[in-house]
């Protein structure tokens, strides 16, 4: 009888140890999964979070900064089922490229600069490093979504003040000062604005 009781106690202890091991394992795995989800979510929506924030801060027409960012760097997102701005976008020599990480985008810009390429658009708002040489302290900072979007917001607000307080004219000038290109951009902008407005 005593042997049987001791055997049951050992079995119970074994089960408790196994259960504790499983619980610890789950606790270790769960944060990694949460972090992975957070990273995917952040990369997909980080530009939009920033544009919405700075639209309010600088009193920019609602949805306009978000729309410009989407038109400039829009990438189809399967999770949100819509085109969203991608923070790790580089445009140079007439070619736009979406990189999976910030580090990859930074490396590409440095490679282009080393090769003598001057006109490079970067980040959520596609800030041109040649036209705005003092916008950022470094290439790394240029890809900081908040800093990139805030600079774009200030630039757009300045254009607004110099374009008869007309947001459409300001947005067209944001893209290009060449009338033909600006008009073509306007068509894209108006269409995208309605889509962004409905999505939000």
Question: What is the predicted function of each stretch?
Answer:
Residues 12-15, 22, 76, 95:
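A generic signature of intrinsically disordered, low-complexity regions enriched in glycine/proline
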Residues 20-29:
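Bacterial N-terminal signal peptides
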Residues 36-200:
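Catalytic glycan-binding domains that act on GlcNAc-containing polysaccharides
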Residues 1-15:
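N-terminal secretory signal peptides that target proteins for export/translocation
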């Amino acid at each position: 009888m005593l042997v049987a009781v001791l055997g049951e106690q050992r079995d119970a202890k074994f089960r408790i140890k196994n259960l504790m091991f499983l619980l610890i394992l789950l606790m270790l795995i769960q944060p990694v999964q949460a972090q992975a989800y957070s990273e995917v979510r952040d990369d997909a929506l980080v530009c939009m979070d920033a544009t919405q924030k700075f639209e309010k801060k600088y009193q920019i027409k609602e949805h306009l900064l978000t729309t410009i960012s989407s038109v400039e760097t829009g990438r189809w997102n399967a999770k949100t089922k819509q085109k969203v701005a991608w923070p790790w976008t580089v445009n140079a020599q007439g070619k736009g490229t979406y990189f999976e990480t910030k580090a990859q985008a930074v490396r590409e810009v440095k490679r282009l600069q080393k090769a003598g390429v001057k006109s490079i658009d970067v980040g959520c708002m596609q800030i041109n490093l040649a036209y705005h040489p003092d916008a950022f302290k470094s290439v790394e900072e240029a890809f900081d979504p908040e800093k990139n979007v805030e600079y774009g917001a200030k630039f757009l607000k300045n254009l607004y003040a110099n374009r008869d307080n007309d947001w459409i004219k300001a947005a067209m000038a944001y893209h290009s000062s060449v009338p033909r290109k600006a008009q073509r951009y306007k068509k894209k902008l108006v269409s995208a604005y309605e889509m962004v407005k409905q999505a939000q």
